[in-house]
Amino acid sequence: MASGGHERANEDYRVSGITGCSKTPQPETQDSLQTSSQSSALCTAPVAAANLGPSLRRNVVSERERRRRISLSCEHLRALLPQFDGRREDMASVLEMSVYFLQLAHSMDPSWEQLSVPQPPQEMWHMWQGDVLQVTLANQIADSKPDSGIAKPSAVSRVQDPPCFGMLDTDQSQATERESELLERPSSCPGHRQSALSFSEPESSSLGPGLPPWIPHSWQPATPEASDIVPGGSHQVASLAGDPESSGMLAEEANLVLASVPDARYTTGAGSDVVDGAPFLMTTNPDWWLGSVEGRGGPALARSSPVDGAEPSFIGDPELCSQELQAGPGELWGLDFGSPGLALKDEADSIFPDFFP
């Protein structure tokens, strides 16, 4: 009997499980599902309202409070200013009413403080001008005083050009004539040093005090005369102007500088080599790009020069003269005496056979 009752209970349990998992649930199950879904929807709505409620409520309350204050102010102003009766409470009308009220209050009560900026009196203005003038004169006097043997340029000397720069300006025409003469002069072989196109060591050192300001910093030689140069870039020109011989030498050296200054594209920049304090293209003659000149009595090139990295066929012929080069087309040489321009494409192919396929 006990075993039969246990089997009936198992069958009832299986029937109830099948009934609960069937596709058509009983009406009681549908009611319970609808009730649970409605309760969950009601629970999520208050949560969302609670999350957005404080910020929304605070904004609405603050906006209502602000509008209420504006309305009260407009009511008070309308009572004081009858011509604004019936106007709308927008910001323009509120500002206009406020300005009109302030003007009316100032006219009725003159003891109110005026809203205008007080102008300084004439005596105070003249006093300020005198103070500024005294400070400017004191700075000029302090600049003109010598400091440990070094003359500092004053404000007046900054306006006027130094004598050496004036001489450079006056000798511009002579420099151009000399440049044309150098262009017409026949060129010599690379074995001979060209004095017009290269600077020796004493010449570059003697040009130290008289270098014009447009010469790059890398051109200035590292000689003991560099201690006489003012830190701001100015030089002692008083002693040079007093000595006529030194001024004449300065004029000649200025002509030499103007006649032999190469193009800035080939002298300045990250790839320019420096030999003895001067740029590589400035210290060597135009045959630097033909190859090394150590075996011909010329100066040795820098180790980092572009000639070391060139092809052997490019350095090959040591007996090639610059006359043969100048017999070619005129585009090969520019006006800057040492900077080979871009030649024709066939010549470039013959010079660099590996770079141009």
Swiss-Prot record:
Subcellular localization(s) per the UniProt record: Cytoplasm; Nucleus
Tissue and organ distribution: In males, it is mainly expressed in testis, while in females it is mainly expressed in ovary. In testis, it is exclusively expressed in spermatogonia, with a preference for prespermatogonia and type A spermatogonia. In ovary, it is detected in germ cell cysts, primordial follicles, and primary follicles but is undetectable by the secondary follicle stage (at protein level). Expressed in the majority of spermatogonia in adult animals, but not in the most undifferentiated spermatogonial population.
Superkingdom: Eukaryota
GO cellular component: cytoplasm; male germ cell nucleus; nucleus
Protein's name in the database: Spermatogenesis- and oogenesis-specific basic helix-loop-helix-containing protein 1
GO biological process, one term: regulation of gene expression
Record keyword Magnesium present: no
Protein's gene: Sohlh1
Gene Ontology terms for molecular function: DNA-binding transcription activator activity, RNA polymerase II-specific; DNA-binding transcription factor activity; identical protein binding; protein heterodimerization activity; protein homodimerization activity; RNA polymerase II transcription regulatory region sequence-specific DNA binding
Subunit architecture: Forms both hetero- and homodimers with SOHLH2.
Domain bHLH residue range list: 54-105
Record's keyword annotation contains Ribosomal protein: no
Induction: Transcription is activated by DMRT1 in undifferentiated spermatogonia.
Low complexity biased stretches: 200-209
Function: Transcription regulator of both male and female germline differentiation. Suppresses genes involved in spermatogonial stem cells maintenance, and induces genes important for spermatogonial differentiation. Coordinates oocyte differentiation without affecting meiosis I.
Biased composition (Basic and acidic residues): 1-14
Region Disordered, residue ranges: 1-40, 145-210
Transmembrane segments: none
Keywords: Cytoplasm, Developmental protein, Differentiation, DNA-binding, Nucleus, Spermatogenesis, Transcription, Transcription regulation
Main location as per UniProt: cytoplasm
Chain intervals with Polar residues compositional bias: 19-31
